[in-house]
Design a protein with these regions (language model features):
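Catalytic-core region of carbohydrate-active enzymes that cleave or remodel glycosidic bonds
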Residues: 175, 196-262
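Active-site mouth of glycoside hydrolases
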Residues: 4-213, 222
Length: 262
């Protein structure tokens, strides 16, 4: 496997602009062009990930959004079909190798510690999250190409205290590391965490099940709770930037081209 090394003077130096509205890489604006490969670490081998990352790098992507633990079954069983065993050190050594690979290509990894279902199911609670977040904070505090993304397709009020604990612990290990929160479809992280010091920027998810987001079925527990913007995802940006405390905001998951209703 060929090694690709891409060097940028400001790579790994992500920060928030002086006016608090944008991401910066060194002294230049940073445009987050992300791709979601949520199960990349759990399902692909090193060669497959190399092929994927090289493809995305060639297309101009600069952030890959992926998750470390995606479902309760990943934790409860070491025999989850088609998945790596997250309870073994071999998995975490593999993650280290992939982070190295991405860094060599000049790619940031938007790393989601655990999908929101683990908080909803109480597998990650105040006690277990404290252990897990400290483990991650110690292991990855010096990674230059890492962006923390908390949440995972979940409303913040499902486990507000747990998510805040996670953010506070991770921020304590590296205060300069960007931390965001991936919310439930058709919501923004600003609805719950905007004033939290650990949250550096907001993410919203305009949704991808159906572009107008008008009728998503029984699973959509957000139908009547928040403002409905339909196709106008720019309105999330407008709302987030209207708050007294200003933070950058980004559509972390808009419509996908391969979904029939997207």
């Amino acid at each position: 496997m060929e090694t690709i090394t891409t060097k940028f003077d400001n790579f790994g130096k992500l920060s928030i602009s002086e006016n608090r509205r944008y991401l910066m890489e060194g002294d230049k604006p940073f445009f987050w062009l992300g791709d979601t490969a949520w199960l990349m670490l759990l399902k692909l081998d090193e060669d497959e990930i190399y092929t994927y990352l090289r493809n995305r790098k060639g297309k101009g992507y600069n952030v890959i959004q992926t998750v470390l633990i995606q479902s309760p079954q990943d934790v409860e069983s070491s025999l989850a079909p088609g998945r790596k065993d997250v309870t073994k050190s071999e998995y975490w050594n593999f993650v280290d190798q992939i982070l190295d690979m991405a860094e060599q290509m000049g790619l940031y990894i938007g790393l989601l510690p655990a999908w929101g279902s683990l908080v909803k199911s109480n597998i990650l609670n105040m006690e277990t999250m404290r252990i897990y977040a400290n483990f991650l904070g110690k292991r990855y505090q010096n990674r230059k190409n890492l962006i923390w993304i908390l949440g995972g397709d979940v409303r913040g009020d499902v486990g507000y205290d747990v998510f805040c604990l996670e953010g506070e612990i991770l921020k304590s290990y590296n205060p300069e590391r960007i931390i965001a929160y991936h919310p439930f479809g058709r919501t923004s992280s600003s609805l719950w965490f905007h004033n939290e010091p650990w949250l550096d920027m907001n993410l919203f998810q305009s949704g991808h099940r159906r572009y107008d987001q008008a009728s998503l079925g029984e699973w959509d527990d957000n139908a009547e709770r928040e403002t409905f913007f339909g196709e106008d995802n720019w309105k999330y940006v407008d709302r987030d930037l209207s708050y007294d405390i200003v933070k950058p905001t980004l559509d972390a998951e808009p419509s996908y081209e391969g979904i029939p209703q997207g």
